[in-house]
């Protein structure tokens, strides 16, 4: 289980900052797929009418986890940067810290 603190002091690349500042940490989430994207328009056009499924449906999923991407927002200039971390099954931001010699559960 990966537990990340809610704030992190790290370098800000923005041209106004260019120094170490406090950053607010959130988890990156994928946005909603656009209906206006060219591939989606083409797919919908091909699917319409008679004839069933026209393109292959992908079934051979290889991975069981996704790489976690942290979204860091600078507290002074509000600039966002993203930082990937390793794959993990359980991820939490700002959870209880594990004490010495104690179990978390």
UniProtKB/Swiss-Prot annotation:
Which Gene Ontology terms of cellular component type are present?
A: cytosol; cytosolic large ribosomal subunit
Q: Tell me which SUPFAM superfamilies the record gives.
A: Zn-binding ribosomal proteins
Region Disordered, as annotated, extends over 28-57
Q: Where in the chain are disulfide-linked cysteines found? A: none
Family assignment? Answer: Belongs to the eukaryotic ribosomal protein eL42 family.
| Source superkingdom | Eukaryota
Name of this chain's protein = Large ribosomal subunit protein eL42z/eL42y
Q: Which UniProt keywords apply?
A: Ribonucleoprotein, Ribosomal protein
| InterPro entries in alphabetical order | Ribosomal_eL44 (IPR000552), Ribosomal_LSU_eL42 (IPR053708), Ribosomal_zn-bd (IPR011332)
* Pfam families (alphabetical): Ribosomal_L44
Cross-referenced PROSITE patterns: RIBOSOMAL_L44E (PS01172)
Q: Which GO terms describe its biological process?
A: translation
UniProt GO MF annotations: structural constituent of ribosome
